[in-house]
Protein backbone atom coordinates (compact mmCIF):
# COMPACT_ATOMS: atom_id res chain seq x y z
CA UNK A 1 0.00 0.00 0.00
CA UNK A 2 1.19 3.52 -0.74
CA UNK A 3 2.96 5.44 1.99
CA UNK A 4 1.96 9.11 2.27
CA UNK A 5 4.63 11.37 3.77
CA UNK A 6 3.82 14.96 4.70
CA UNK A 7 7.04 16.96 5.02
CA UNK A 8 6.51 19.68 7.62
CA UNK A 9 9.93 21.28 8.06
CA UNK A 10 9.54 24.90 9.28
CA UNK A 11 11.35 26.30 6.22
CA UNK A 12 9.00 24.41 3.92
CA UNK A 13 5.92 25.61 5.82
CA UNK A 14 7.12 29.22 5.67
CA UNK A 15 7.83 29.12 1.95
CA UNK A 16 4.59 27.28 1.25
CA UNK A 17 2.64 30.07 2.97
CA UNK A 18 4.27 32.57 0.59
CA UNK A 19 3.45 30.31 -2.36
CA UNK A 20 -0.22 30.19 -1.34
CA UNK A 21 -0.44 33.99 -0.98
CA UNK A 22 -2.18 35.48 -4.03
CA UNK A 23 0.03 38.59 -3.75
CA UNK A 24 3.15 36.56 -4.64
CA UNK A 25 4.15 37.36 -8.23
CA UNK A 26 5.39 34.90 -10.84
CA UNK A 27 9.12 35.54 -10.27
CA UNK A 28 8.94 34.95 -6.52
CA UNK A 29 6.48 32.09 -7.02
CA UNK A 30 8.92 30.28 -9.34
CA UNK A 31 11.82 30.75 -6.94
CA UNK A 32 9.79 29.55 -3.96
CA UNK A 33 8.52 26.45 -5.76
CA UNK A 34 12.08 25.55 -6.73
CA UNK A 35 13.30 26.12 -3.17
CA UNK A 36 10.57 23.98 -1.62
CA UNK A 37 11.25 21.20 -4.13
CA UNK A 38 14.93 21.28 -3.19
CA UNK A 39 14.10 21.08 0.53
CA UNK A 40 11.64 18.24 -0.06
CA UNK A 41 14.21 16.33 -2.12
CA UNK A 42 16.08 15.46 1.09
CA UNK A 43 13.14 13.37 2.32
CA UNK A 44 12.02 12.08 -1.08
CA UNK A 45 15.47 10.59 -1.72
CA UNK A 46 15.99 9.26 1.81
CA UNK A 47 15.84 5.62 0.72
CA UNK A 48 18.26 5.80 -2.21
CA UNK A 49 20.85 3.05 -1.88
CA UNK A 50 24.48 3.80 -1.04
CA UNK A 51 27.69 1.83 -1.33
CA UNK A 52 31.11 2.11 0.27
CA UNK A 53 33.90 3.52 -1.89
CA UNK A 54 37.58 4.11 -1.29
CA UNK A 55 38.79 7.70 -1.60
CA UNK A 56 41.94 9.59 -0.71
CA UNK A 57 41.68 12.74 1.38
CA UNK A 58 44.59 15.21 1.66
CA UNK A 59 45.48 13.30 4.85
CA UNK A 60 44.96 9.59 4.15
CA UNK A 61 42.91 6.91 2.42
CA UNK A 62 39.43 6.30 3.80
CA UNK A 63 36.08 4.68 3.07
CA UNK A 64 32.99 6.78 2.35
CA UNK A 65 29.43 6.15 1.18
CA UNK A 66 28.10 7.30 -2.18
CA UNK A 67 24.90 6.68 -4.12
CA UNK A 68 24.76 3.29 -5.78
CA UNK A 69 22.38 1.04 -7.61
CA UNK A 70 19.64 2.53 -9.74
CA UNK A 71 20.04 6.08 -10.97
CA UNK A 72 17.35 8.75 -10.72
CA UNK A 73 14.94 10.16 -13.28
CA UNK A 74 12.87 13.25 -12.52
CA UNK A 75 9.66 13.33 -14.57
CA UNK A 76 7.58 16.52 -14.35
CA UNK A 77 3.96 16.55 -15.43
CA UNK A 78 3.83 19.51 -17.82
CA UNK A 79 3.58 22.28 -17.43
CA UNK A 80 3.48 23.02 -13.70
CA UNK A 81 5.72 20.10 -12.73
CA UNK A 82 8.62 21.81 -14.52
CA UNK A 83 8.76 24.35 -11.73
CA UNK A 84 10.02 21.71 -9.32
CA UNK A 85 12.74 20.23 -11.54
CA UNK A 86 15.41 22.87 -10.93
CA UNK A 87 15.33 22.31 -7.18
CA UNK A 88 15.68 18.56 -7.62
CA UNK A 89 18.58 18.88 -10.06
CA UNK A 90 20.51 21.10 -7.68
CA UNK A 91 20.77 18.13 -5.33
CA UNK A 92 20.79 15.34 -7.94
CA UNK A 93 22.58 16.92 -10.92
CA UNK A 94 23.21 13.57 -12.61
CA UNK A 95 19.49 12.73 -12.78
CA UNK A 96 17.91 12.47 -16.21
CA UNK A 97 14.71 14.40 -16.89
CA UNK A 98 11.71 13.01 -18.73
CA UNK A 99 8.56 14.94 -19.63
CA UNK A 100 4.90 13.97 -19.63
CA UNK A 101 2.47 16.48 -21.10
CA UNK A 102 -1.07 16.41 -19.72
CA UNK A 103 -3.71 19.10 -19.49
CA UNK A 104 -7.05 19.05 -17.73
CA UNK A 105 -10.19 19.28 -19.84
CA UNK A 106 -12.11 22.14 -18.23
CA UNK A 107 -15.44 20.45 -18.94
CA UNK A 108 -14.79 16.85 -17.89
CA UNK A 109 -11.89 17.65 -15.50
CA UNK A 110 -10.14 14.59 -16.96
CA UNK A 111 -6.48 14.69 -18.11
CA UNK A 112 -5.62 14.71 -21.81
CA UNK A 113 -2.15 13.55 -22.99
CA UNK A 114 -0.25 15.63 -25.55
CA UNK A 115 3.45 14.76 -25.00
CA UNK A 116 5.66 12.01 -23.58
CA UNK A 117 9.47 11.76 -23.75
CA UNK A 118 11.37 9.61 -21.27
CA UNK A 119 14.93 8.32 -20.78
CA UNK A 120 15.43 5.05 -22.68
CA UNK A 121 16.54 3.31 -19.49
CA UNK A 122 13.52 4.48 -17.46
CA UNK A 123 12.96 0.93 -16.23
CA UNK A 124 16.36 0.94 -14.53
CA UNK A 125 15.86 4.24 -12.70
CA UNK A 126 14.26 5.47 -9.50
CA UNK A 127 11.54 7.73 -10.90
CA UNK A 128 10.34 10.87 -9.12
CA UNK A 129 7.19 12.36 -10.67
CA UNK A 130 6.73 16.06 -9.89
CA UNK A 131 3.51 18.08 -9.95
CA UNK A 132 2.82 20.95 -7.52
CA UNK A 133 -0.85 20.04 -7.10
CA UNK A 134 -2.49 16.67 -6.50
CA UNK A 135 -6.17 17.58 -6.89
CA UNK A 136 -8.48 14.92 -8.33
CA UNK A 137 -5.48 12.67 -8.95
CA UNK A 138 -6.39 12.10 -12.60
CA UNK A 139 -3.22 13.55 -14.12
CA UNK A 140 -0.96 11.75 -11.64
CA UNK A 141 -2.72 8.43 -12.21
CA UNK A 142 -2.43 8.74 -15.98
CA UNK A 143 1.22 9.85 -15.81
CA UNK A 144 2.14 6.93 -13.54
CA UNK A 145 0.25 4.52 -15.80
CA UNK A 146 2.21 5.82 -18.81
CA UNK A 147 5.48 5.39 -16.93
CA UNK A 148 4.65 1.81 -16.03
CA UNK A 149 3.73 1.07 -19.64
CA UNK A 150 7.20 2.33 -20.61
CA UNK A 151 8.82 -0.02 -18.09
CA UNK A 152 9.23 2.11 -14.95
CA UNK A 153 9.04 0.05 -11.77
CA UNK A 154 10.12 2.27 -8.89
CA UNK A 155 8.03 5.44 -8.86
CA UNK A 156 7.44 8.17 -6.27
CA UNK A 157 5.06 11.11 -6.56
CA UNK A 158 6.15 14.48 -5.20
CA UNK A 159 3.80 17.46 -4.86
CA UNK A 160 3.51 20.66 -2.85
CA UNK A 161 -0.17 20.38 -1.94
CA UNK A 162 -2.37 17.29 -2.07
CA UNK A 163 -6.13 17.04 -1.66
CA UNK A 164 -7.43 14.12 0.36
CA UNK A 165 -9.49 13.00 -2.65
CA UNK A 166 -6.40 12.98 -4.86
CA UNK A 167 -4.39 10.96 -2.37
CA UNK A 168 -7.20 8.41 -2.13
CA UNK A 169 -7.49 8.12 -5.91
CA UNK A 170 -3.75 7.65 -6.49
CA UNK A 171 -3.29 5.14 -3.67
CA UNK A 172 -6.19 3.07 -4.98
CA UNK A 173 -4.97 3.17 -8.60
CA UNK A 174 -1.26 2.72 -7.81
CA UNK A 175 -0.79 1.24 -4.32
CA UNK A 176 2.91 0.69 -5.02
CA UNK A 177 3.63 4.43 -5.46
CA UNK A 178 4.61 6.48 -2.40
CA UNK A 179 3.40 10.09 -2.18
CA UNK A 180 5.39 13.00 -0.73
CA UNK A 181 3.69 16.33 -0.08
CA UNK A 182 4.26 19.50 1.91
CA UNK A 183 0.57 19.98 2.75
CA UNK A 184 -2.71 18.07 2.70
CA UNK A 185 -5.84 20.14 2.02
CA UNK A 186 -9.26 18.69 2.72
CA UNK A 187 -11.43 19.50 -0.26
CA UNK A 188 -11.92 20.43 -3.90
CA UNK A 189 -14.30 23.07 -5.22
CA UNK A 190 -16.79 22.49 -8.05
CA UNK A 191 -14.08 23.36 -10.60
CA UNK A 192 -11.72 20.71 -9.25
CA UNK A 193 -9.35 23.18 -7.57
CA UNK A 194 -7.86 22.41 -4.18
CA UNK A 195 -9.28 24.50 -1.30
CA UNK A 196 -7.55 26.54 0.08
CA UNK A 197 -4.79 25.45 -2.33
CA UNK A 198 -2.76 28.02 -4.26
CA UNK A 199 -4.78 28.56 -7.44
CA UNK A 200 -3.52 27.33 -10.81
CA UNK A 201 0.16 26.48 -10.34
CA UNK A 202 1.00 26.66 -14.05
CA UNK A 203 -0.62 30.08 -14.47
CA UNK A 204 1.19 31.44 -11.42
CA UNK A 205 4.55 29.96 -12.42
CA UNK A 206 4.56 31.36 -15.93
CA UNK A 207 2.14 34.27 -15.84
CA UNK A 208 -0.07 32.81 -18.59
CA UNK A 209 -3.47 31.15 -18.63
Swiss-Prot record:
Q: Which UniProt keywords apply?
A: Allosteric enzyme, Glycosyltransferase, GTP-binding, Magnesium, Nucleotide-binding, Transferase
Top-level EC class as recorded in UniProt? transferase
Question: Does the keyword section mention Glycosyltransferase?
Answer: yes
Gene Ontology MF terms? GTP binding; magnesium ion binding; uracil phosphoribosyltransferase activity
Q: Which Gene3D superfamilies match?
A: 3.40.50.2020
Q: Which cofactor does it need?
A: Mg(2+)
Q: Lineage, please?
A: Bacteria, Bacillati, Bacillota, Clostridia, Eubacteriales
InterPro entries, per the entry:
PRibTrfase_dom, PRTase-like, Upp_B, UPRTase/APRTase, Ura_phspho_trans
So what EC number does this one have? 2.4.2.9
Which pathway does the record list?
Pyrimidine metabolism; UMP biosynthesis via salvage pathway; UMP from uracil: step 1/1
Checking PANTHER family in the record gives: ADENINE PHOSPHORIBOSYLTRANSFERASE (PTHR32315), URACIL PHOSPHORIBOSYLTRANSFERASE, CHLOROPLASTIC (PTHR32315:SF4)
Positions of uracil binding: 194, 199-201
Family matches, as Pfam families:
UPRTase
Please describe what this protein does: Catalyzes the conversion of uracil and 5-phospho-alpha-D-ribose 1-diphosphate (PRPP) to UMP and diphosphate.
Q: Which family does it belong to?
A: Belongs to the UPRTase family.
Q: Which biological process terms from the Gene Ontology are attached to this UniProt entry?
A: UMP salvage; uracil salvage
Chemical reaction(s) catalysed:
UMP + diphosphate = 5-phospho-alpha-D-ribose 1-diphosphate + uracil
What does the UniProt cofactor note say?
Binds 1 Mg(2+) ion per subunit. The magnesium is bound as Mg-PRPP.
Regulation of protein activity: Allosterically activated by GTP.
The protein depicted here goes by the name: Uracil phosphoribosyltransferase
Residues that coordinate or bind 5-phospho-alpha-D-ribose 1-diphosphate:
79, 104, 131-139, 200
